[in-house]
Amino acid sequence: MIRMLRFGAKALAVLALATLSQAAAAGGNSTKDTPAEPVERGVYFSGYDVVTDSRYTYSGIIVALNGDMGRDGFFARAYGAYGNFDQNPGDGRQWQGDVALGYMFTRSSIGYEIYAGVDYQNVRLRPDDPTAEVRGTEWGFKVGAGIETEKELPYYFRLEGNYSTAFNSYWARARVGVNRGRFTFGPEASVVGDEDFDAQRVGGFVTFDVKLPQFRPMELTLSVGHQFVSGSNNNTDGTGGIGGGEGTYGLVNLSVTF
């Protein structure tokens, strides 16, 4: 009887070890077959905007302070831009940069972000015009916010904007569209201005992924439409100003996560 109990105990031990070994092997194969996606710590973006009598180049970076853009948390943001524009007479140059701290969170497949920081703007006119409302250097307080649907949804919506006390400048844009595989497209509308001008844009956009070997997927956005202007930019001679004149606009934007 004792021998039978010992034999049974040994058999159970062998069976338990075999079961654990199979479970460990299965777990190892599962991890190997479905590797975890890399965590996105931030995003870099850059673009070029052109409209009648105005050219504008910008770059920026957003970094999640918790190390994961997919989680709720604080982020740091830096942005810089350079523009040149034609006026009557002469031309002008514009430099702008800001640094900000913000918070992002997701609820029901919709992402939200808010941020605030310090803004720097410098505008130089040639020839100089002492009567111009937007001229010289100004520091200001900048606030911004955005809302965007997640990419997994069949439809797309994004609303974003910001305001700075430097020259009372503002910008806002709304996009609605549909997601079709790698492509997202639809209409867009935006407003931009400062103490010197106001402009409104209506057009369309398309966004798609660009995949290159050894690189993370990049997102490219193209948009085109018409700009309407008022204020000092609405010159009778057709020459624009700091925000450009009335006419066709085009935008190229590239973003990549890291």
Label for each model-derived stretch:
Residues 20-21:
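N-terminal signal peptide c-region/cleavage motif recognized by signal peptidases
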Residues 24-88, 228, 236, 249, ...:
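Short glycine/proline- and aromatic-enriched beta-strand/turn motifs that initiate or cap beta-hairpins
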Residues 27-41, 64-75, 106-112, 150-156, ...:
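Short loop/turn motifs that connect adjacent beta-strands in outer-membrane beta-barrel proteins
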Residues 42, 55-59, 63, 95-99, ...:
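Hydrophobic, lipid-facing positions within transmembrane beta-strands of outer-membrane proteins
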Residues 181-258:
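Predominantly the C-terminal beta-signal and adjacent terminal strand-loop region
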Residues 74-169, 189, 224-248, 256:
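Outer-membrane pore/translocation modules
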Residues 170-175, 186, 190:
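Conserved binding-pocket/active-site segment within a compact domain
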Residues 2-12:
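Bacterial N-terminal signal peptides that target proteins for export
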